């Protein structure tokens, strides 16, 4: 018996070990993929536009991101490639057989213009391609034929496309390989039975963000035995599809958040199989419409380890609400809960481990709520209104098991640590988060009965003013402390004495009110790794402040008033582990010699937005690992030679937005020798690039100085002269040179003619009148040349003859009347832009046959071209896919003139006012053309055009009284039809015969009525509709009811229509995401008055201005997250128009309005909105004031709004204290959203509840630049950023100046009377 036991134990142990190994290998594989995504590689040898992990003929991992590549790089076709990533490159096509010799494992093409995948696109990769990622393209169907033979494909991502249907055979051939299938953010409205038939090893299926309103019970009837993750978030499901989920026996994660589910009970109209019981690890039900959880709500669930109800309007939890399921973790945050039955969780007494009820409206906890709970470990009641009346009885049952307790929040009743300690005897407590203490200081007696197990302590928003000596002597195991959002002025020297060995993170952001960094208390923290004293009043720190912090890795001191960093503050032998320092937004005035010296681990150094005007020699020296150094937004006007010395791995040096009068290569000594050094000195005050002292000749030993700069940005200066030979120190290193937005007059060989590795040259937005014929004599590797927005009238014929690899040329916005013959002699041309010139004909003779053969895009708009001859578009343009000849003077299009361009997919002939389009004008394009623009060409009838593959057809601004029915037959695949600003008097009947129509624009037509039948017959899957600027006199609210899948609607606030109301119009449209509201435009209507001989005609003036109070009264759709108010007739908006918002997120835009200001209380009436982004960039010339949108002091407080993003560049505002809130908000944003420190979110918040996850950090720097490009009209055009930093002193608490002045006056008056 004993031997048998050991055998069984051995087999079990072996099995478990094998499973763990498999799991670890898969986890490591996914981690490896993520590492591959994030790792930075050097530029490719063959093309520096991309990065490669290898430099040989085997290129390894290739990244091409944010650089123009209309076609795949030719180097890929000539090498082995492990991974290829093409992101936002303008790619339009994957050529058949192009990748066949690469042996590729992973292909990612995202953010491009792929409209289809050829059947032979992946020929040769049948046994090598494992991952195919094609999101954010223009695909409309699953490329099943091209995928069919990929035997190893395990990961397929087709998200963010326009796919509408899934066929039975869409994934044929992938049955034995596909494990992950991502179809999120497409246009799928229904799933047919057996849609995923045969995918027996599929593990993850993502259908998020589609238009699914129900799931067919037979969709997963085959069982899909390995499917563990099913993501259905952000659809329009009204119930949980229990019958469809029944066959999925391995399902562990079900995400149906952001739908319109009202109940967990299922459909009452038919019986759900009793055997359908779900066993899940994660059930996501966030942001649905669940209002109540009745008893036995989980009758179709057996086990649910984690259940998420966040954001549902649940107000009451009844008894046995979670019966009969076994649930370990419940997250019910920001629901508006006001009442919980004392026996609501009684069915979970043996299973519940985590209960998070943060952000609700609970005022009390019943003292029997947690009775009999044996395993409850985490309780979070953060940001409620709770007053615990019987604390001892409330927590008595869990005082042995509770590990984490969160009672923080300034609406909760004040927490007395002594009472908390007595009521719980929490000897096992690991994490505690509280606010509003009964006392103003923390002392040793406060933690007397807490155990050494306490590791994480957060006391925020508690109005603390002091920390006493030995305050933590009873909790010696503390690892993390957070005292943010306090007013601590005193920290006694021995406050941290007992936790110096254990504390690894200390955060006191916006929590310390002293003027000097408390160095003495910090000397005990020898194990500290992260220190955050940001967003305070600190103005000084001693040179020994951090000398005892030998393990420090991250130091955040941004948003203070520090004036100087003394030499010796950071020392290499002490701070050998320091990786990142943030001193941005302080008052530093200079950087002295050896300030940052010998810090061997330092990788990032942030010094942006100070007052630095001088940097001394060797200020930055011997920083072997430094990769990023930002000095952006200072006042630097004096940069000493060799200021930067021995920084071999520096990749980015940002000195933009300073006051540099010149730029000298002598600033650098051994900088960037091991990296791809990018130096940004844009937005300075450089007027001349004079002869460099670094090239004054050879030194006494005969050597020369050489720079390692590869990317140099000198744009947005006022450079008018570049001395010959100026770039000589960098000639052999430069690959990118940006000189746009300057005042250059010409280009010469002495400046640009000897840069053998230069591949990107930007000279746009200058005053260039002429180009020397030999300007690029020895600059033979140029790929991209930008000469747009200059004054060129002539191009030398031989200027590009030495250039071998030219691909992209931009001559737009010049004065060119033509281009010389054979200007582009060598092959490889991909894009030519000569728009906005004075061209008289298509410059076909300027491209040799070799150059024209590879051309993909040709931009000819806004010229004087009057005819297109067959010779102009001869057989040379066999690869052309994009042709724009809009805004010219074309008169006629000959028959079949485009027939010699078999790949032409996009053609724009708009705004040729006298153009005559014949029936046969597009002959030859039947199988290729996808987008056609014929706007504003004076059409009165639509020619009979047969383009069966056309998807987008623009006919706006013509004179069409009707649209023939035959058009629908000839363009049966049409998806977007623009008929705006014609003479249509009703919705054309032909729109009913377009089965794939998704976008319909009818704006500006003289349509007078919309009734309940107006859109009957139009494809019910229509997603975008524009019905703005009609001349309506009759309107019915059911006119849009036949379009249930509408996502985007543009309409006018028809104020002249009685009872016109937008929320009522959208009451049944649960899928609306975007709403564009146009201001009513005035128009006249002639009506008959009287009868008989006394009858007379009367003119009525309609379309009067409105503030939208009546038109926006009511509840808006719950998915509505994007609202735009547009039109110069908007002069005022009512402060309550967004009171009906039911989404937690809102992006609001003001576009071309006449608003002078938003109402002061506008953002106080935002419904359920918690996070708002505001965009006022476009044509709001009268707007001068913006009230503070923030109604909460920190992000994501219940019943309050926090601004997440603000875009207002190129606007002129009044910069006074009414706008002073922007500075306060900026600091909060950097504190909570842009912080480098994340431990407070992962430690003090329960699962998946981090503000950083909500907001992200991707646009933190972009926001700062937006404020730099916003000007102060009342301060002579000063940058708003500079005004906020130094001029607008409006008080730390964002007090209004007038209010503060009023208070001061009243106090003075009171004192006078008292005296």
Swiss-Prot record:
> Which PROSITE patterns does the UniProt record give?
LRR
Q: Subcellular localization, per the record?
A: Cell membrane
Gene Ontology CC: plasma membrane; rhabdomere; rhabdomere microvillus
Ranges for domain LRRCT come to: 1211-1274
Q: According to the UniProt entry, where is the signal peptide? A: 1-29
Q: Which Gene3D superfamilies match?
A: Ribonuclease Inhibitor
> Could you give a single Gene Ontology term from the biological process aspect?
rhabdomere development
Which tissues express it? Expressed in photoreceptor cells and their axons in the adult retina, the ocellus and larval photoreceptor organ.
Start-end of the LRR repeats?
80-101, 103-124, 128-149, 152-173, 177-198, 201-222, 226-247, 250-271, 279-300, 326-347, 351-372, 375-396, 401-424, 477-498, 527-548, 551-572, 577-598, 601-622, 625-646, 649-670, 676-696, 708-729, 733-754, 757-778, 781-802, 805-826, 828-849, 854-875, 879-900, 903-924, 928-948, 949-970, 973-994, 996-1017, 1021-1044, 1045-1066
Checking InterPro entries in the record gives: Armadillo, Leu-rich_rpt, Leu-rich_rpt_typical-subtyp, LRR_dom_sf
Q: Which SMART domains match?
A: LRR_SD22, LRR_TYP
Top-rank taxon, per record: Eukaryota
This chain's protein is named Chaoptin
Tell me the organism. Drosophila melanogaster (Fruit fly)
**What gene name is given for the protein in this entry?**
chp
């Amino acid at each position: 018996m004993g031997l048998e036991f050991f055998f069984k134990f051995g087999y079990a142990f072996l099995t478990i070990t094998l499973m763990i190994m498999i799991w670890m290998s898969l986890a490591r594989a996914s981690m490896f993929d993520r590492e591959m995504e994030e790792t930075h590689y050097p530029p490719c040898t063959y093309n520096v536009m991309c990065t490669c992990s290898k430099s040989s003929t085997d290129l390894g991992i290739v990244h091409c991101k944010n650089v123009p590549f209309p076609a795949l790089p030719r180097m890929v076709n000539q090498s082995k490639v492990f991974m290829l990533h093409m992101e936002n490159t303008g790619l339009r096509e994957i050529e058949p057989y192009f990748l066949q010799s690469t042996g590729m494992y992973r292909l990612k093409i995202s953010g491009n213009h792929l409209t289809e995948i050829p059947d032979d696109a992946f020929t040769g990769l049948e046994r090598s391609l494992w991952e195919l990622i094609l999101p954010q393209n223009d695909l409309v169907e699953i490329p099943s034929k091209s995928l069919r033979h990929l035997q190893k494909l395990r990961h397929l991502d087709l998200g963010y496309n326009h796919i509408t249907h899934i066929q039975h055979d869409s994934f044929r051939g992938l049955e034995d390989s596909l494990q992950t299938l991502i179809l999120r953010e497409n246009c799928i409205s229904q799933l047919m039975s057996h849609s995923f038939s045969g995918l027996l090893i599929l593990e993850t299926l993502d259908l998020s963000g589609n238009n699914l309103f129900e799931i067919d019970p037979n969709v997963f009837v085959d069982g899909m035995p390995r499917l563990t993750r099913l993501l259905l978030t952000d659809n329009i499901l009204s119930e949980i599809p229990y019958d469809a989920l029944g066959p999925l026996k391995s399902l562990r994660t079900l995400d149906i958040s952001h739908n319109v589910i009202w109940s967990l009970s299922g459909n009452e109209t038919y019986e759900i199989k009793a055997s359908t019981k779900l066993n899940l690890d994660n059930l996501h039900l966030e942001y649905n419409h669940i209002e109540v959880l009745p008893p036995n709500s989980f009758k179709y669930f057996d086990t649910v380890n984690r259940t998420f109800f966040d954001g549902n309007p649940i107000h009451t939890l009844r008894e046995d609400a979670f019966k009969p399921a076994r649930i370990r973790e419940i997250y019910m945050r920001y629901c508006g809960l006001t009442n919980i039955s004392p026996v609501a969780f009684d069915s979970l007494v043996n299973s519940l481990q985590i209960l998070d009820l943060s952000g609700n409206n609970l005022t009390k906890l019943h003292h029997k709520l947690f009775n009999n709970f044996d395993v409850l470990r985490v309780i979070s009641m953060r940001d409620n209104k709770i007053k615990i009346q019987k604390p001892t009885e409330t927590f008595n049952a869990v005082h042995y098991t509770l590990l984490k307790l969160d009672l923080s929040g300034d609406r909760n009743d004040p927490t007395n640590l002594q009472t908390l300690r007595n009521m719980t005897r929490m000897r096992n407590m690991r994490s505690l988060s509280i606010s509003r203490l009964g006392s103003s200081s923390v002392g040793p007696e406060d933690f007397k009965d807490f155990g050494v197990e306490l590791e994480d302590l957060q006391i925020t928003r508690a109005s603390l003013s002091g920390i006493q000596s030995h305050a933590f002597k009873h909790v010696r195991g503390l690892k993390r402390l957070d005292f943010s959002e306090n007013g601590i002025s005193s920290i006694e020297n021995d406050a941290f004495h007992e936790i110096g060995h254990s504390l690894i993170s200390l955060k006191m952001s916006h929590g310390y009110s002293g003027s000097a960094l408390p160095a003495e208390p910090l000397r005990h923290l020898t194990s500290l790794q992260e220190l955050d004293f940001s967003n305070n009043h600190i103005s000084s720190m001693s040179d020994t402040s951090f000398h005892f912090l030998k393990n420090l890795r991250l130091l955040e001191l941004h948003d203070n008033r520090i004036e100087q960093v003394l030499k010796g503050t950071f020392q290499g032998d002490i701070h050998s582990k320091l990786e990142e320092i943030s001193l941005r937004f302080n008052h530093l005035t200079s950087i002295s010699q050896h300030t940052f010296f010998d810090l061997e681990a330092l990788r990032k150094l942030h010094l942006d937005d100070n007052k630095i005007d001088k940097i001394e020699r060797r200020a930055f020296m011997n920083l072997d690992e430094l990769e990023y150094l930002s000095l952006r937004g200072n006042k630097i006007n004096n940069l000493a030679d060799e200021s930067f010395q021995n920084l071999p791995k520096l990749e980015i040096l940002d000195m933009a937005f300073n006051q540099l009068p010149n730029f000298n290569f002598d600033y650098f000594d051994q900088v960037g020798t091991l990296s791809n050094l990018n130096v940004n000195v844009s937005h300075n005050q450089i007027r001349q690039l004079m002869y460099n002292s670094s090239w004054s000749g050879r030194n006494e030993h005969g050597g020369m100085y050489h720079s390692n700069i590869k990317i140099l940005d000198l744009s947005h200066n006022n450079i008018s002269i570049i001395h010959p030979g100026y770039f000589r120190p960098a000639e052999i290193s430069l690959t990118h040179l940006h000189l746009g937005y300057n005042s250059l007059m010409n280009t010469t060989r002495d400046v640009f003619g000897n840069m053998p590795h230069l591949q990107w040259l930007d000279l746009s937005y200058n005053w260039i009148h002429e180009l020397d014929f030999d300007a690029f004599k020895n600059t033979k590797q140029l790929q991209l040349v930008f000469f747009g927005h200059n004054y060129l009238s002539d191009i030398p014929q031989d200027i590009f003859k030495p250039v071998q690899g030219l691909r992209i040329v931009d001559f737009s916005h010049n004065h060119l009347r033509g281009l010389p013959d054979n200007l582009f002699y060598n092959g490889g041309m991909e894009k030519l832009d000569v728009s906005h010139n004075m061209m008289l004909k298509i410059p076909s003779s300027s491209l040799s046959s070799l150059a024209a053969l590879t051309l993909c895009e040709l931009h000819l708009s806004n010229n004087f071209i009057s005819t297109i001859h067959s010779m102009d578009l001869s057989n040379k343009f066999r690869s052309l896919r994009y042709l724009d000849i809009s805004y010219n003077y074309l008169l006629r299009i000959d028959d079949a003139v485009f027939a010699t361009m078999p790949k032409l997919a996009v053609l724009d002939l708009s705004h040729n006012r006298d153009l005559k389009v014949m029936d046969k004008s597009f002959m030859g394009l039947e199988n290729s053309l996808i987008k056609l623009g014929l706007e504003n060409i004076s059409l009165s009838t639509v020619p009979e055009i047969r383009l069966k593959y056309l998807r987008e057809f623009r006919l706006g601004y013509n004179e069409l009284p009707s649209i023939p029915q035959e058009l629908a037959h000839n363009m049966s695949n049409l998806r977007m039809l623009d008929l705006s600003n014609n003479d249509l008097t009703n919705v054309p009947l032909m729109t009913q015969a377009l089965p794939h129509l998704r976008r319909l624009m009818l704006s500006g037509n003289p349509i007078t009525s919309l009734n309940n039948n107006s859109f009957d017959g139009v494809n019910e899957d229509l997603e975008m509709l524009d019905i703005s600027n009609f001349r309506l006199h009759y309107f019915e609210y059911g006119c849009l009811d036949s379009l249930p899948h509408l996502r985007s609607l543009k309409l006018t606030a028809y104020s002249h229509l009685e009872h016109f109301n937008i929320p009522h119009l959208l009451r049944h449209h649960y899928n609306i995401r975007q709403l564009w509201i146009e201001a009513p435009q005035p128009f006249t209507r002639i009506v008959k008055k009287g009868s008989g001989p006394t009858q007379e005609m009367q003119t009525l003036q309609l379309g009067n201005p409105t503030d939208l109070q009546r038109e926006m009264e009511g509840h808006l759709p719950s998915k509505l997250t994007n609202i735009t108010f547009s039109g110069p007739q908007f002069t005022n908006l009512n402060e309550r128009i967004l009171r009906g918002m039911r989404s937690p997120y809102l992006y609001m835009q003001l576009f071309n309005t006449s608003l002078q200001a938003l109402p002061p209380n506008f953002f106080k009436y935002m419904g359920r909105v918690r996070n708002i982004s505001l965009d006022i960039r476009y044509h709001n010339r009268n707007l001068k004031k913006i009230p503070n949108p923030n109604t909460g002091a920190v992000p994501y407080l219940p019943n309050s709004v926090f601004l997440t993003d603000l875009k207002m560049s190129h606007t002129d505002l009044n910069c006074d204290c009414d706008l002073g809130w922007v500075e306060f908000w900026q600091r909060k944003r950097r504190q909570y959203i842009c912080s480098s420190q994340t431990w407070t979110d992962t430690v003090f918040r329960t699962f998946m509840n981090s503000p950083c996850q909500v907001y992200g950090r991707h646009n933190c720097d972009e926001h700062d630049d937006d404020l730099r490009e916003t000007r102060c009209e009342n301060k002579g055009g000063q940058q708003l950023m500079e005004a906020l930093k130094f001029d607008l002193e409006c008080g730390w608490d964002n007090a209004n100046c007038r209010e503060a002045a009023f208070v001061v006056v009243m106090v003075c008056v009171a004192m006078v009377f008292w005296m």
